[in-house]
Amino acid sequence: MRKINKIRIAKNVIEIESKSLASIANKIGQSFQKACDIILKCKGRVVTIGLGKSGHIAAKSSATLSSTGTPSTFIHAGEALHGDIGGLKNDDVALIYSNSGETKEILQLLPIIKLLKVNIISIVGDKKSSLAKSSDIVIDCGVSSEACPLNLTPTSSVITAIGISDALAITLLECRGFTSKDFAKSHPDGSIGKRLLKKVSDVMFTKKLPIINYNNKLIKSIEVMSKYNHGVVIAIDEKKNVVGIFTDGDLRRTLK
């Protein structure tokens, strides 16, 4: 094995990819704006399509769109040729990913998509490709080189396609006035959803309450607190009115 400077190589990869991403920002213009307008007018879903690495990007893009207010689904280009293209309806928008723009399976799908009169937005690395020529809107995410020294491994081209996809999703989010509460609705079991959607009544305990008389000794509060494992006891008076609470934090401070 050759002795190489691993840190230098890693930094070089990041630098190349960063420059590629920055160059894509300069390409964003009318095509991007038209793509946003078409999607905002769409009454169906944004159906993302891709194969290989572009398929992974398309799947990620669909997930991001769906979670930020734009209904979307992903269709694998290979599976699309064997029935899955039936999931594309004429009120949808096709968002197609291909770095070369010449992916055979993608090109085979185009006549079927056109029969549905579906708008085709392509995110491609070659704006002169067959896919680009067959698209209604072309978003160019071509890069001068990959971060791979062989200029073969999809690296910079992947980063730029993801960057464009994220830019599209967030632009649509802002256009729709999508809020954190809307985001929480599509993430009900995540930390954001729990924080924004759950009410105190959903999580508070209402049965087998750790109740003591406020005149009880401190040792009694420890016993009750340990028994119910809530980290707190509720103190009541002779008329069963709540007069206060005593927490495990209060206990630690008392015993210092």
Regions found by a protein language model. Name each.
Residues 40, 44-163, 167-172:
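Glycine-rich phosphate-binding loops that contact phosphosugars or nucleotide phosphates
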Residues 17, 50, 95, 168, ...:
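Terminal peptide-recognition signature
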Residues 147-148, 250-256:
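A short, polar/charged loop-to-alpha-helix boundary motif
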Residues 133, 147, 174-205:
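Internal, active-site/partner-interface "lid" segment
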Residues 194-224, 230, 235-237, 242-243, ...:
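Bateman/CBS regulatory modules and CBS-like beta-alpha motifs in cytosolic regions of diverse proteins
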Residues 9, 122, 230-233:
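Short loop/turn microsegments at loop-to-beta-strand junctions
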Residues 31-35, 80-84, 220-221:
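Short acidic active-site motifs
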